[in-house]
């Protein structure tokens, strides 16, 4: 059955209008943002009875996890978002939105001559902008005049990031908090604002319950989904060799590293001869000494490429090697039709899916670096256990209450964090000291940041599952669950040589003398590149195991061994 785009599968009058909360699951590249942009512009919709209903433009607050997506929306001429994140953050008061909504801009659209004037009704911003906006503007006495009554719909794009990014950011907490507060205001009849959460990677949200009167729309199997044709598993050495060969042949490639240091090492050393045709992109630059001319040039070139991608939704034609980090795993479109190969170091499902989906034309090959070191949690596992103690939370909030009293803020009186620098500094200190607590502006208290724990647990479990599958020879099965439409295989030459050897020697599933096993082992050591004692430990990642041929001392096969292919049912 032919896959459809999201707009072809959703009817606003039946799927959106009746509900305060709508959860949309559809694959990467299915047109989620196109659908939301249509809500902001207004459009005509066919009804089941044949009528065509005109849907008026909605005021949309689109919250996304990546600045690149905001820049993309800002720079696109035919979208209905009239501002950018920095303008939104610099609003002095909530009331400034009134004059913003009353202003107009020129909009060019497909299907019209020239341009049309539209009211600047909708805003796109990052998760971080929501955190800063709450700090600057939220007051309990103005709750009924806050964002939920300034917009018709709050859309959370890349909703999985509310959990996924929680491991290293506080901003996702405030997006989650805004969603919950908006739903409470809606249930209390104080707003008609709807919340739409969208993602193409719902796995990390599996434990989330649908709120009362919520509507779940799962179109993962019905809608278009950008997936690579082939997913290949290889170690770092083999990946670098493959990259060299492809670059030498004139191809363009993308490499997603887990660390900035890896990006810089590849740029400076491994692919130095291609520096004039290479580009880098990453967030953190504290590893670079800005006093050095080379580092300043790297940062300038990085900023240029990031701005180019945001404006053009593609890499420059003269760039053949793009080295980046998870900064660009979501929120951007790379529409180059001549990029067919990508390499990724991540071992988590949601990150792999998001990274592969950046190239909208689709990849021919996605390489997963099987021996790449994964990022790990910096704090002790006891941190969350300690943070879960109610007496600690009560103590932090009692101290906060004392700080407010010292500042002359009466109990339960409305106040603004922005107006009290001392309290603002105390909140920042507590959140740094206790990373599993966040100050909640709506609750006016420190609350447990459980999404952070969920995020760290998810990535730890993903890494453990990858390691276990690798040791047990089940990597192909694991990755096949990530990309069900793709062909999954080992790319490495070691695997090919080992498979070819066993096929040619015809030594599988037959009793072997110890001398024959030693001869096989000696050959395998030359392929792997190092000696080994435990056959199963070293050969399971390649899909082979060894066992005794017989435990019966009277059997002619006693003392012999049998080598089998894992998964054949004969182990």
Say what each PLM segment does.
Residues 60-70, 246-270:
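Conserved strand-helix element at the start of the C-terminal RecA-like helicase core
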Residues 287-324:
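Conserved helicase ATPase core of P-loop NTP-dependent helicases/translocases
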Residues 16, 39-40, 382-571:
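The feature captures the C-terminal accessory region of ATP-dependent helicases
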Residues 345-366:
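Conserved SF2 helicase motif VI
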Residues 333-345, 366-368:
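A short beta-strand element within the Helicase C-terminal
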Residues 144-180:
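SF2 helicase catalytic motif II
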Residues 202-246:
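Interdomain hinge/linker at the junction between the two RecA-like core domains of SF2 helicases
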Residues 78-135, 305-309:
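Inter-Walker segment of RecA-like/P-loop motor cores
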């Amino acid at each position: 059955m032919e896959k459809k785009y999201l707009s072809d599968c959703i009817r606003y009058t039946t799927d959106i209008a009746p509900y305060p909360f709508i959860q949309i699951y559809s694959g990467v590249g299915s047109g989620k943002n196109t659908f939301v942009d249509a809500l902001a512009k207004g459009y005509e919709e066919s009804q089941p009875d044949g009528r065509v209903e005109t849907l008026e433009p909605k005021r949309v607050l689109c919250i996304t996890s990546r600045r690149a997506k905001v820049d993309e929306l800002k720079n696109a001429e035919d979208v209905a978002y009239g501002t950018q994140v920095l303008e939104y953050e610099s609003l002095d008061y909530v009331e400034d939105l009134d004059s913003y909504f009353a202003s107009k801009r020129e909009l060019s659209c497909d299907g019209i001559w020239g341009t049309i004037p539209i009211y600047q009704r909708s805003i796109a911003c990052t998760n971080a902008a929501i955190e800063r906006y709450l700090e600057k503007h939220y007051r309990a006495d103005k709750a009924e005049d806050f964002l939920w009554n300034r917009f018709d719909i709050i859309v959370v794009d890349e909703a999985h990031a509310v959990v996924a990014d929680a491991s290293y950011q506080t901003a996702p907490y405030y997006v989650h908090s805004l969603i919950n507060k908006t739903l409470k205001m809606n249930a209390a009849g104080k707003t008609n604002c709807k919340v739409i959460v969208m993602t193409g990677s719902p796995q990390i949200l599996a434990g989330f319950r649908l709120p009362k009167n919520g509507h779940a729309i799962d179109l993962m199997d019905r809608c278009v989904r950008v997936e690579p044709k082939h997913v290949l598993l290889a170690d770092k050495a083999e990946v670098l060799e493959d990259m060299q060969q492809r670059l030498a042949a004139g191809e363009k490639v993308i490499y997603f590293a887990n660390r900035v240091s890896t990006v810089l090492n590849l740029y400076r050393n491994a692919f130095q001869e291609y520096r004039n045709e290479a580009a880098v992109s990453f967030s953190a630059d504290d590893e670079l000494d800005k006093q050095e001319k080379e580092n300043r040039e790297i940062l300038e070139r990085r900023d240029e490429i990031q701005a180019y991608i945001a404006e053009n939704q593609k890499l420059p034609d003269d760039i053949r090697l793009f080295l980046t980090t998870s900064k660009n795993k979501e929120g951007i479109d790379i529409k180059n039709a001549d990029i067919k190969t990508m390499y990724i170091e991540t071992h988590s499902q949601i990150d792999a899916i998001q990274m592969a989906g950046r190239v909208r034309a689709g990849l021919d090959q996605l390489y997963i670096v099987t021996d790449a070191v994964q990022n790990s949690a910096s704090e002790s596992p006891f941190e969350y256990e300690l943070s879960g103690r109610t007496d600690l939370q009560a103590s932090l909030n009692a101290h906060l209450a004392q700080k407010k009293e010292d500042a002359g803020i009466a109990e339960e009186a409305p106040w603004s964090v922005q107006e009290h620098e001392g309290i603002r500094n105390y909140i920042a200190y507590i959140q740094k000291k206790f990373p599993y607590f966040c100050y909640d502006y709506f609750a006016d208290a420190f609350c447990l940041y459980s999404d952070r724990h969920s995020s760290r647990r998810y990535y730890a479990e993903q890494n453990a599952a990858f390691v276990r599958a690798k040791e047990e020879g089940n990597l192909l099965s694991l990755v096949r669950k990530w990309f069900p439409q793709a062909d999954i295989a080992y790319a490495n030459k070691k695997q090919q040589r080992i498979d070819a050897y066993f096929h040619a020697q015809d030594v599988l599933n037959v009793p072997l003398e110890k001398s024959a096993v030693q001869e096989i082992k000696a050959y395998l050591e030359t392929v792997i590149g190092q000696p080994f004692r435990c056959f199963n430990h070293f050969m399971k990642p390649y899909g082979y195991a060894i066992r005794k041929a017989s435990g019966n001392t009277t059997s002619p096969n006693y003392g012999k061994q049998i080598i089998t292919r894992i998964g054949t049912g004969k182990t």
